[in-house]
Amino acid sequence: MPQNTRHTSIVEMLSTPPQLPNSTDLNSLSEQTDKNTEANKSDTESLHKSISKSSSSSSLSTLDNTEYSNNNGNSLSTLNSQNLLSVHRQEWQHTPLSNLVEQNKLIFIRGSISVEEAFNTLVKHQLTSLPVENFPGDMNCLTFDYNDLNAYLLLVLNRIKVSNDKITSDCQNGKSVPVGEIVKLTPKNPFYKLPETENLSTVIGILGSGVHRVAITNVEMTQIKGILSQRRLIKYLWENARSFPNLKPLLDSSLEELNIGVLNAARDKPTFKQSRVISIQGDEHLIMALHKMYVERISSIAVVDPQGNLIGNISVTDVKHVTRTSQYPLLHNTCRHFVSVILNLRGLETGKDSFPIFHVYPTSSLARTFAKLVATKSHRLWIVQPNDNQPTASSEKSSSPSPSTPPVTTLPSLASSYHSNTQSSRMANSPVLKSSDTSNNKINVNINLSGPSPSQPQSPSTAMPPPQSPSNCPASPTPAHFEKEYRTGKLIGVVSLTDILSVLARKQTHHKEIDPQMARKQRGHIG
């Protein structure tokens, strides 16, 4: 197979922080500031305050078509809000939360709407969570996310038990279930709220403890203006890293040096600052992976072979790929097969290698880890120890396939049904994970719980060929080739957004004793 036809990956291009816009203007501004410092310290402080004020008074959602100028006429060019690029002349810890507010992405749902309506809203707006209001202006919301959706699916499939018998009965008899009831079934952390005048030094103490998101309010704390998630904060810090020189020492450090992740396979238990490695065998059924994520209260799980080598990743958001009737047999197929399916769904564009790579090495730099988390939009990366005949951590920098953004999933309603057994008959009209239909916005869910029979032809949704090789070869590789290309070594650890934010908090803020496992301990897990 040709070795030099692979396209440059996005991850490779993100191995160093992206350039800020108009670096010439910024350098000029910096030089002018230095001159002012020598001439008049008070003038310099005034300039810094002016820039900081300009930055904090404008949320990222209103930066489009805006131009700022300092007192000396130096223009700070238009910034694109979608790139999360902003200009700062300060340390990252002092950045006000107002800089990260995206009011255009703040969408509430009522607790009285059905689970399927809530799911449709997630898909429509390409969000991963939604605040659920009990009444307009509710300041103590619970959030609806894909973990709740997974719990709902498992409840409908009679794979889990909850104390609310009515909810159980309604789910399994096809009745509409209010989303406000479903979000109560999954343990949640408190709904943290901070005013927009607070800074990142404050919020990182919360997000670094494992809380996934924080509500940003107005100064009076009477109105929610936006939601700041762990992933958005990581993206913001990465894309503005060149504006924060104090980040560089950490970004240049390796995961091993920072003691992030379980880096010793012989260790019985990770330390309190490290995340547990939770995996599932590739030959186990997908439904078992979804159940394990529910029990362990995690949002993704590693898929490994019998030797412990990493062969893939399944996220709780992938539950959206088992929503059509034709896709339900996937639940009873293997995790290994599902990995190939979701890679296909993420797509190959014009023969480019667009596979997201969810792994790093112990010697990978924090910058490299930042880049991959941003590029894959993932909450965690798996740490692997490469085999002797596989690429080293250093060679990974020039050989990683590029990640891609998954396409928006369209889930049309289904008009037909089949009732192959008692369970599927009971669930035939259950509105599980339904999608909007342009005609009637109704979903008819029909689940074949028996799984695909050996003689039954697979539907187009499930009978997807293995992904093509990155060399533009027209022939699809065999499963063995798929594993050879993308199995990266023995799974020895995991690094999450929480791990990284907790390190930033301990190293560069006053939160020296932060426990990255605190929020997860609060949520608990089912033994």
Curated annotation (Swiss-Prot):
GO terms for cellular component: cytoplasm; nucleus. Residues 1-75, 385-481 are annotated as: Disordered. The keyword RNA-binding does not apply. Its main location: cytoplasm. It comes from the Eukaryota. Keywords: CBS domain, Cytoplasm, Nucleus, Phosphoprotein, Repeat. GO terms for biological process: cellular response to glucose starvation; regulation of mitotic metaphase/anaphase transition. Residues 52-61, 391-417, 450-462 have a biased composition (Low complexity). It is found in: Cytoplasm; Nucleus. The modification Phosphoserine is found at residues 9, 42, 46, 430. GO terms for molecular function: protein serine/threonine phosphatase inhibitor activity. Residues 21-31, 418-449 have a biased composition (Polar residues). The keyword Transmembrane does not apply. InterPro entries: AMPK_gamma/SDS23_families, CBS_dom, CBS_dom_sf, Ssd23. Residues 101-162, 185-243, 272-330, 335-391 form the CBS domain. Residues 32-48 have a biased composition (Basic and acidic residues). Belongs to the SDS23 family. Involved in DNA replication and cell separation during budding. This is Protein SDS23.
